[in-house]
């Protein structure tokens, strides 16, 4: 029978159904057709619907395949058959997953259900509570079972490859679906993919006797019949036959082609029954696990790694048969364990490790490095801190001991390394995994899957170290290892923290490091802390910040290697020994690097000059550029991309993208420059690195040392600062920026070394001193100097960026340097023309007009002609003719005779004379009659050689200079370059600087650029012709957009000056001649930009959003540029919103209901959370009644409990008068000055009362009648409930009340932070379950909590102060 067939059923009587529940015989079990699967469910409660008259049953789906709908309450109608006096209901197999706590702290019931479905492909198998812990082992250590699966498949591949003609083996690797042999395609990638599918079945085989599921499964089979593979496939109902196929086939080979999986299960059942008969099942059940594990080990060829007590291979039947012959059979089959004897450590282990890693010629750098390696490897000191200069070789201090530990066969050590930034992960894993000496994997694998039994070293970042999942796994290490590996010889080795000074110096990240204090440091054999910039004071504070005791009070010399007598207290309580190699060696660090401090007009321009010069001298070298902001990083990358290959990184990129880009720069030899913020200055080791350039005006001494320290073998470090703009200020408590002056002296002061100010040897690699530099570095400096002199003499002014780079608009920069190929070609032509004019004038035009043409020919053509093209006849000619008469004739007469006449004699005869006759008619004849004969004719012949004659004749009449220069752009380039090369200027012509172009060509290029930009934007934002919003652009579904939509967000949401410039296009904020909007565009780019800004606000608190507005300052006047910047991280923002607002969507979409009883903190800390729904409503109406009587200003009251009077507000007849009353008393002004409303436009809050929130207003006004009925039902004197404007004032006041928000989010655990007013208003209208399970709107609960914070006027008690006191509640804006 089906419930959906209404013709066979009729409504059930409530009383009859209630009695039927007491008599189970009257109930008919029926699968629910309301579910996607036919899953039996359980009746939890039922009630009679007054409207429909149906009895409705509340039931639970506990095993649904759709995880999002698991444990969801479903209401179905109960029907009774006309011919059958029995009721249809729904039941469920035990146990009840929702009832009672699961005896495992790792898994929740939903995950258990997923585990069961993954393993068995069914939902209705019975298992007891002991099975929970067994099944949890799979999730805790999935990595271990994955690794075993990989080994199984590799072993099978080897067998099949060795016996290709064996039909049985080939049948093992034949896909029964397609019938095609797949052994040939079973490559490494395929092995790993199928290994993941095999892992659950591998787990089953190893734990076959520990699960009661198999007992129930075998008990359902008739007699002692074995189950063959095909029967198993049918019974387990696999959705993917490939999973069962591989498992059954591999079991076939493993069990000597005799046993099948069904045989294993049947054997397990027979052994269990025999043991049960003997009454001693519990001790002997473990023997099957030992037998199965031993078979796997032998079959995989791992006998050398494990020691078993078996003398020969025995199958399950042998075990059963042998039971009768021996009563103590369980004593003969012992648990598989690793070899117990421990191999001793020796100093020779370190030397052997070094030879494995670096070859037979390995030697330590110095005696200090040798002794430290021995200290770490041999000594019992539980915690060691090392400070060594950058480039010293700190990595080898733990790398060699790790290799030595891995060589020991008695114990498996698992160690962990943590670095501060994601960008260092790739470099660390490449370095530590080279030569195959260590098995290295990311820490994320350990956190998600557990220890795989193979990895020697896990590498992660500080965030992984502070994560709860990591600390929990370390806390449960002993239990996990014992249950998974059947041995206690897998131990935790070293905990290594690199650059640990960041715990103290990274002020903005210190809140993220709080979880490290929960880590069980005592579980590790040793903790090692390394840094190049951690003096004693910094090191001691950093260690105490993560929960350790700190440094030993007495500084320990490296030569004092005596062992400590008191190690019983554990690592966390024992002081850390500090080895300060910098003080021991008494050498100032970074002396091998040439450090140059330069003040320049334009940092990017100077940096580009240096980089081009470096790559001219050393084409295979690499460089790092450290910028001050993330915006500057992207802009430099865009503008420099046409000169060399660039990789850029900053903190806003995703973790995977950072790792990928860092790895690309380290491994790809063609990559030249790495541009990033300061995160690229720590820990990266690049052999080809020869230059570091720092553009950050706020570098502190640690950032400087770390950046210069990247130059391991010497090189050049440039600190470029803009003139008169050095920022000498602290950043929120961090170290102050470095000062102008000697860098070496500041480094000495930081490390506590003796000052040599004013003494011999003060300058080491700085201030022009080269005495301590290597010969290669000195040679590089000299070659750079010679190249700079050659550029100066050749008059090659490289203008890579505008001089006002920092002040210019970001979008203009991106439009100029980061456009399409067509734009790039335009720039190249412009630069080529400029260089052509420069070289042509130097060789030919030198004798034309003035003596300064030789030196300033580029500026003459680029600036004067463009600017004064119309006035050339009147002003330019007159001025230059004066100089021509005075100086040029004297100076250039020799050059004209020597070079120009010889070169241009042929062209002068045919073209120039006839051409210039028209040219000199009006302008040149009068002034240059003396020079025309000698210089003008020869000059024109050079510039108008073949193709410009016709154009010159027409245009020279008005301005000879401008037209001639314009026409030589196309025709003279080839000849000019040849002439320049003949003159010996080939070296200078390799550079093509960007210069200005004349006005006419600029207009043509500008229009082309606008059209091109318009097409690109239309392709990037194709749906702007429709009613598109930024959430659609990010990829959200329509049902999600409905609740996340940004109601009330318009241009007034933006702060003053952000996308609000006047006199420009309203759609794109560009000049009308450069407008990129297109016809038919309904949604402007400006609107998309302010919506994108609102999305960023969704993800940031007040302080973070304020900093973000400062970061995007270059885009304040460029919404199109900001949209491009926003779209780069489109996927990351989408994921962030999905993660941060999952709870919000679940609540607003009514998929989850807030219950105050689920909030433990609320029940303990607030009387409101123990009130009934009736009491909450009474309190709500009482608050509004008091406000109305006292004529209190509503918004101000809910903002900070200030009971100011505002009679006009209560007497207002419409919204306009209401808002005017608020503005008159200064409410909006106080709101902006006291709260985060100041981060929006001045009219933003005011306009919330006008056209926004229409749907919510309609919904609220419809509910006013319900409020009146509630007051009558409660016996309260009916009072006028607040109208919409007063109600909205309440919500706005609560939203900007920081004290109230913090308290509510603390008490009500189901909600989190929202940072947009429309989301807050929407959230306030959801319903919550009060303590008596009655529903009340959330805003009523908010008002009750707000009232509780202000007074003791609540029923049955007063407020228990937990977080905030009443005195501090007045400080709203702090």
Swiss-Prot record:
Induction context: Induced in absence of telomerase TLC1.
SMART domains noted in UniProt: DEXDc, HELICc
Keyword Oxidoreductase: no
Top EC category: isomerase
Residue stretches making up the Helicase C-terminal domain: 609-758
Record EC number: 5.6.2.-
Low complexity composition bias: residue spans: 832-975
This protein's record includes keyword Iron: no
Biased composition (Basic and acidic residues): 976-999
A cellular component annotation (GO) from this entry: cytoplasm
A Pfam family that the UniProt record links to this protein: DEAD
Keyword terms, alphabetized: ATP-binding, Helicase, Hydrolase, Isomerase, Nucleotide-binding
Domain Helicase ATP-binding: 375-552
Source domain of life: Eukaryota
Region (Disordered): 321-345, 832-999
Residues noted as binding ATP in the record, renumbered to the chain: 388-395
GO biological process: telomere maintenance via recombination
One MF term in the entry's GO annotations: ATP hydrolysis activity
Locus of motif DEAH box: 498-501
Task of the protein: Catalyzes DNA unwinding and is involved in telomerase-independent telomere maintenance.
Family: Belongs to the helicase family. Yeast subtelomeric Y' repeat subfamily.
Record-given protein name: Y' element ATP-dependent helicase YLL066C
Organism: Saccharomyces cerevisiae (strain ATCC 204508 / S288c)
């Amino acid at each position: 029978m089906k419930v959906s067939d209404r013709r066979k059923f009729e409504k059930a009587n409530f009383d009859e159904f209630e009695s039927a529940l007491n008599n189970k015989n009257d109930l008919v079990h029926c699968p629910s057709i309301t579910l996607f699967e036919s899953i039996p469910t359980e009746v939890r409660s039922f009630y009679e619907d007054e409207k429909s008259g149906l009895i409705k049953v509340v039931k639970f789906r506990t095993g649904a395949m759709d995880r999002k709908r698991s444990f969801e309450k479903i209401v179905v109608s109960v029907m009774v058959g006309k011919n059958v006096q029995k009721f249809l209901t729904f039941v469920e197999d035990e146990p009840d997953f929702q009832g009672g706590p699961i005896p495992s702290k790792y898994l929740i019931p939903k995950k258990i259900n997923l585990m069961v479905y993954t393993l068995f492909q069914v939902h209705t198998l019975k298992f007891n509570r002991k099975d929970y812990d067994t099944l949890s082992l799979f999730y805790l250590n999935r990595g271990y079972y994955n690794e075993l699966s990989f080994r199984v498949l590799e072993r099978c591949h080897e067998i099949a490859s060795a016996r290709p003609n064996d039909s049985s083996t080939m049948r093992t690797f034949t896909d029964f679906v397609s019938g095609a042999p797949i052994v040939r395609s079973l490559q490494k990638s395929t092995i790993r993919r199928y290994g993941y599918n095999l892992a659950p079945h591998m787990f089953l085989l190893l734990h076959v006797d520990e699960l009661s599921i198999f007992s129930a499964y075998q008990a359902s089979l008739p007699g002692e019949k074995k189950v063959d593979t095909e029967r198993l496939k049918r019974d387990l109902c696999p959705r993917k036959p490939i999973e069962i196929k591989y498992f059954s086939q591999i079991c076939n080979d493993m069990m000597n082609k005799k046993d099948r999986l069904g045989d294993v299960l049947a054997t397990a059942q027979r052994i269990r029954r025999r043991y049960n008969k003997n009454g001693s099942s519990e001790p002997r059940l473990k023997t099957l696990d030992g037998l199965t594990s031993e078979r796997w080990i032998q079959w995989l060829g791992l006998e050398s790694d494990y020691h078993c007590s078996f003398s020969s291979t025995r199958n399950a039947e042998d075990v059963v048969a042998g039971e009768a012959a021996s009563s103590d059979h369980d004593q003969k089959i012992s648990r598989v364990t690793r070899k117990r004897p421990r191999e001793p450590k020796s100093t020779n282990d370190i030397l052997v490790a070094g030879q494995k890693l670096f070859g037979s010629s390995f030697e330590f750098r110095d005696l200090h490095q040798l002794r430290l390696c021995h200290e770490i490897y041999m000594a019992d000191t539980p915690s060691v801190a090392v400070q060594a200069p950058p480039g010293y070789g700190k990595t080898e201090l733990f790398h060699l001991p790790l290799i030595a530990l891995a060589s020991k066969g008695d114990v498996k050590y698992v160690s962990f390394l943590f670095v501060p930034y994601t960008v260092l992960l790739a470099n660390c894993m490449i370095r530590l995994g080279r030569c195959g000496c260590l098995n290295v994997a990311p820490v994320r694998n350990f956190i998600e899957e557990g220890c795989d039994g193979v990895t020697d070293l896990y590498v992660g970042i500080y965030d992984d170290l502070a994560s709860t999942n990591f600390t929990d796994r370390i806390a449960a290490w002993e239990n996990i290892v014992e249950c998974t590996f059947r041995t206690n010889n897998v131990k935790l080795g070293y905990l290594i923290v690199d650059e640990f000074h960041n715990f103290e110096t990274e002020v903005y990240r210190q809140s993220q490091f709080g979880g490290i204090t929960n880590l069980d440091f005592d579980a590790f054999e040793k903790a090692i802390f390394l840094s190049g910039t951690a003096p004693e004071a910094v090191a001691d504070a950093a260690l105490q910040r993560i929960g350790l005791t700190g440094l030993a009070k007495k500084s320990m010399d490296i030569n004092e290697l005596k062992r400590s007598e008191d190690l019983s207290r554990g690592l966390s309580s024992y002081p850390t020994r500090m080895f300060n190699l910098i003080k021991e060696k008494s050498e100032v660090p970074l002396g091998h690097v040439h450090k140059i401090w330069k003040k320049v007009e334009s940092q990017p321009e100077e940096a580009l000059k240096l980089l081009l010069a470096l790559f001219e001298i050393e084409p295979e070298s690499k460089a790092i550029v450290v910028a001050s902001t993330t915006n500057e990083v992207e802009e430099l990358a865009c503008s420099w991309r046409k000169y060399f290959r660039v990789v850029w990184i900053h903190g806003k990129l995703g973790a995977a993208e950072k790792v990928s880009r860092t790895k690309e720069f380290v491994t790809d030899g063609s990559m030249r420059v790495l541009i990033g913020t300061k995160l690229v200055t720590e820990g990266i080791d690049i052999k080809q690195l020869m230059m570091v350039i720092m553009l950050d005006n706020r570098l502190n001494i640690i950032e400087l040392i770390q950046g210069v320290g990247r130059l391991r073998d010497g090189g050049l470090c440039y600190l470029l600062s803009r003139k008169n703009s050095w920022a000498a200020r602290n950043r929120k408590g961090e170290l102050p920026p470095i000062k102008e002056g000697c860098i070496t002296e500041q480094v000495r002061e930081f490390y506590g070394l003796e000052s040599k100010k004013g003494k011999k040897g003060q300058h080491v690699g700085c201030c022009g001193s080269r005495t301590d530099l290597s010969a290669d570095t000195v040679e590089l400096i000299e070659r750079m100097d010679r190249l700079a002199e050659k550029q100066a003499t050749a008059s090659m002014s490289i203008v890579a960026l505008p001089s006002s780079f920092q002040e210019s608009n970001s979008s203009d920069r991106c439009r100029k340097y980061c456009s399409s190929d067509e734009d790039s070609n335009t720039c190249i032509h412009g630069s080529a023309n400029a260089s052509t004019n420069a070289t042509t004038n130097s060789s030919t035009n030198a004798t034309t007009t003035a003596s300064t043409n030789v030196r300033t020919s580029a500026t003459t053509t680029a600036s004067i002609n463009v600017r004064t093209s119309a006035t050339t006849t009147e002003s330019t000619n007159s001025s230059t003719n004066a100089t021509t008469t005075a100086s040029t004739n004297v100076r250039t007469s020799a050059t004209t005779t020597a070079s120009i006449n010889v070169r241009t004699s042929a062209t002068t005869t045919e073209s120039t004379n006839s051409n210039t006759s028209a040219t000199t008619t009006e302008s040149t004849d009068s002034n240059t009659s003396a020079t025309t004969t000698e210089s003008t004719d020869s000059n024109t012949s050079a510039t108008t050689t073949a193709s410009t004659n016709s154009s010159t004749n027409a245009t020279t009449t008005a301005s000879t200079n401008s037209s001639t220069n314009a026409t030589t752009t196309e025709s003279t380039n080839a000849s000019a370059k040849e002439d320049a090369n003949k003159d010996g200027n080939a070296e200078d012509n390799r550079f093509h600087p960007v210069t200005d172009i004349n006005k006419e060509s600029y207009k043509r290029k500008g229009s082309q650029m606008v059209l091109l930009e318009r097409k690109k934007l239309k392709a990037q934002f194709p749906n702007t012709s429709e009613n598109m919003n930024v959430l659609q652009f990010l990829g959200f579904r329509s049902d999600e957009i409905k609740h996340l939509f940004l109601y009330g967000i318009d241009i007034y949401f933006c702060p003053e000056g952000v996308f609000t410039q006047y006199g420009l296009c309203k759609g794109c904020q560009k000049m009308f001649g450069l407008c990129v909007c297109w016809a038919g565009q309904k949604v402007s780019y400006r609107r998309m930009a302010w919506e994108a800004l609102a999305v960023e606000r969704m993800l940031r608190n007040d302080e973070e959003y304020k900093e973000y507005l400062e970061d995007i300052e270059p885009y304040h006047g460029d919404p199109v540029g900001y949209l491009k910047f926003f779209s780069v991280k489109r996927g990351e923002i989408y994921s962030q919103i999905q993660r941060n607002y999952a709870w919000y969507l679940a609540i607003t979409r009514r998929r989850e209901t807030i219950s105050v009883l689920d909030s433990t903190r609320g029940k303990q800390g607030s009387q409101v959370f123990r009130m009934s729904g009736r009491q909450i409503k009474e309190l709500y109406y009482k608050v509004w009644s008091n406000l109305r009587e006292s004529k209190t200003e509503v918004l101000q009251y809910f903002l900070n409990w200030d009971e100011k009077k505002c009679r006009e507000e209560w007497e207002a007849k419409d919204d306009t008068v209401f808002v005017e009353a608020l503005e008159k008393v200064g409410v909006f002004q106080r709101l902006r000055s006291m709260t985060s409303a100041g981060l929006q436009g001045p009219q933003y809050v005011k306009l919330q009362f006008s056209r926004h929130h229409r749907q919510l207003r309609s919904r609220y006004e419809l509910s006013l009648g319900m409020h009146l009925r509630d007051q009558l039902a409660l016996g309260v004197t009916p009072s006028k409930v607040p109208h919409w404007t007063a109600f909205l004032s309440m919500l706005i006041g609560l939203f900007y009340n920081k004290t109230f928000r913090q308290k509510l989010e603390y008490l009500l655990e189901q909600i989190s932070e929202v940072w947009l007013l429309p989301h807050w208003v929407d959230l306030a209208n959801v319903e919550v379950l009060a303590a008596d399970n009655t529903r009340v709107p959330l805003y009523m609960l908010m008002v009750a909590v707000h009232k509780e914070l202000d007074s003791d006027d609540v029923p049955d008690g007063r407020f228990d102060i937990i977080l905030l006191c009443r005195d501090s509640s007045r400080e709203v804006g702090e």
